[in-house]
Amino acid sequence: MAEKSSAAASAERYREAGVAPVNEQPGFISLIDQLRQTFGSGARHPLLDFGHFANVLDIGYQEAIAISTDGVGTKAIVAQMLDKYDTVGIDCVAMNANDVICVGAEPFAMVDYIAVEAADDHLLSEIGKGLVEGARRANIVIPGGEISQIPQIIRSERKGFGFDLVGTCIGTVDKDRLITGDKMEAGDVIVGLASSGIHSNGFTLARTALLETAHLRLNESAGELDCTLGDELLKPTRIYVREIMQMIREGLPIKALVHITSDGFLNLARVSQGIGFVMEWLPEPPPIFSLIQEAGGVSDGEMFVVYNMGVGFCVVTSPEAADRVQAMAQNAGNQAWRLGHCIEDADKKVELKPKRLMGQDGRFTPY
């Protein structure tokens, strides 16, 4: 039988888990159209449209302000189940700072919003530890935030410990050095930087597959994991700020910077203008991904839509600079690989040759 398109399969699985995709729903489109009405001209107008990892605001000076917001999603549920909250703050910083650097901006501050079921001292203190560690890794400050106690809205696996954690990060970038992907050309090289694991995406599917379908236990190891399942799932999202900023400061010809989150390598198309991407080599994904795939009966196509599959960030650069990009990432303590190259393609397709998958319009289809 022919395999279902991974986009359709992914949507079905998320609906089964209680999450419906919104990016093509009329309400989402209407919201975006309304927010565009706030865009003006002159000082303070956005330099990019919706859909990039971060937007950039012209404030009337040569330096512009990059801004992005994101949260940890249902990774918070795993933290609640384990009563372990000291790493989700790192995830919150990572999800925001990694987006801000995608436009070539250097992040310098983030504010947080913590919505809680109850203002538990231990919960808040442990979240704070993670935020501080994340700020250290990203070289930013956290000058403020908000705590909202809303038990009527926030519920949890452990009564009294429900929370949601969101951040908004800002950075600065010279308008002449803005990185948007518009300078990519055929022959440019795609360098992938290793992820630390599942990062902060796909947790609804992971919990459904691992805990509800396969009945695995968070406090036990499984498969080829070198730690308990819970510790693996809570590994903090890797922060790529220092190595990316070094590449920019040293003047490497960086054509595009891509945070690999939900939608996987399809995120490359977010920064493309008439460029397609051919992945000729892929690293072996960490064991957590095969564990999810086997437990949930998930296709390769769906896995590469939902998860980073071992590559948390991509740098598109000229062929002559690819070795230096790899070396800088490795000097920062991270693995990095040449994954593929760019081609001229008005459809902005992403081909994963080792998996015989073609990506376009939010899906990977086998060929």
Where on the chain are the PLM-derived regions?
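Glycine-/charge-enriched secondary-structure boundary and capping motifs
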Residues: 2-16, 123-141, 154-163, 223-232, ...
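N-terminal amphipathic/basic leader segments beginning at the initiator methionine
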Residues: 2-39
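Residue-level signature of catalytic and energy-coupling elements of molecular machines
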Residues: 20, 70, 187, 259, ...
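Glycine-rich phosphate/pyrophosphate-binding loop regions near the starts of catalytic domains
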Residues: 30-196
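Short secondary-structure boundary/capping elements
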Residues: 48, 88-95, 236-239, 284, ...
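Short, acidic (Asp/Glu-rich) active-site segment that either coordinates a divalent metal cofactor
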Residues: 175-225, 229
